[in-house]
Amino acid sequence: HAVRRARLAGGERVVVMGAGPIGLLVLQVLKAKGAGWVAVVEPRAERRRHAEALGADLVLDPGAGDPSQAIAEATDGDRAGVVFECVGSPAAFAGAFRAAGKMGRIVLVGLTPESVPLNALLLLAHEKELVGSSAYTDEFPEAISLLARGLVRTAPLITARVPLERSREDGIEALLRKDDGHIKILVMPGTGGRS
């Protein structure tokens, strides 16, 4: 749904902020829909490796410097035509705003309860667009088709399988720790964790 809302043009340069489950799925759909170049910005090393393995053309660590500068260099100063903010944090929103070029579209996918600062002068002067994305049921048939044709793969996103009785300790708490590289943990009822 988010990719459709972005009105992606074939060959367009795109940035995905965040390589969690949503960001990695957006990356794959972008590649399937003909994005010309996709950069992913992600602070966690294991998630950056997943983004690279799933086809990102450039993977950046925001802790190593301002990603918008590397994006500007990689695009001869143009920056991105579309940026997907898949994190849901004020810092990621600010980074998305900087990564978008003139007349760029910033698609808000990540959720945050916090207010985010917005430089209205730059929004107007650079004619950037903010696009929200949350409803998606109309795209289920297309999503299923992308999965069936192997253009979007979910198996690489599953980084662990846990039995239902251990889902809190080995599932939820592992995801909350954010230190072990998990993307998605699959809970396996009645299997003792065996797949």
Enumerate the language-model features and the residues they cover:
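Mid-domain Rossmann-like dinucleotide-binding core that forms the NAD(H)/NADP(H) cofactor-binding site
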Residues: 1-64, 69
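Glycine-rich phosphate/pyrophosphate-binding beta-alpha loops
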Residues: 129, 135-136
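Structural detector of well-ordered beta-strand residues that form the stable sheet scaffold
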Residues: 15, 39, 105-108, 131, ...
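Glycine-rich cofactor phosphate-binding loops and adjacent beta1-alpha1 units
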Residues: 5-10, 49-129, 193-195
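C-terminal hydrophobic helical "lid"/dimerization subdomain
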Residues: 94-98, 137, 141-195
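Glycine-rich phosphate-binding loop at the start of an alpha helix
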Residues: 20, 45, 90, 94, ...
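Conserved acidic E/D residue at the C-terminus of a beta-strand in Rossmann-like folds
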Residues: 42, 110, 134
